[in-house]
Amino acid sequence: MRTFLKLTLISTALLLTACSTISKEPVKHIDMYVKPYYDARDGRLEQINVNKDIDALLLKNTQKDFESAVNIIEKKVDFVSPMTMFALSARAYDFGLRDEAVKWFYRGQNRLITALYVLDLDKLTVSNNTAFGQLVGQHVNPYAFCDLNKQHKAAQDAIDWAKNHPYQTVFLPQLPSKHPDRKQALKE
């Protein structure tokens, strides 16, 4: 029941975001500035600081290098941050890969929800991650919700992915947790 309620709340929030951000002009790329993590203008990434393994590739601003970055991340997803996933979503959107953008955005959202539920993070970390997610989401969600069946499948795929690839960062003892048993918290 809790999972159903959480999914319903998340879906409602995503739908409200999508409906409130629909533009008359089609958006071709995501221009945003999230200091000091991400700066993109006119579909070109100017600065990025989300994952040292792929930042340089993403800065090359080519689809081929984006795909190489995705391959690197997919080989070690267990510790990949929500912010990295949001950056992949934004870059996919910039290259016209809308379904890929939705996939990475939803994965990032689920990973962020997991981290926020289990970890006792400082306010700045929470703010930075949620702001990044909201900025990307206001572009990705209108596309995702154009086809509700496709959106539902993408959301479910992301939930399944999150269950099959638990965010290992939540188990690091140096990060404070809201729960004495982190594994049990993930099951809730």
Predicted region positions:
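Sec-dependent signal peptide recognition
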Residues: R2-I10
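C-terminal motif of bacterial Sec signal peptides marking the signal peptidase cleavage site
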Residues: L16-A18
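Hydrophobic/aromatic side-chain positions at a characteristic register within alpha-helices
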Residues: N61, Y93-D94
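TPR/TPR-like (Sel1-like) alpha-helical repeat modules
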Residues: R98-T114
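N-terminal alpha-helical interaction modules that lie
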Residues: I22-F79, R111, A115, T125-E188
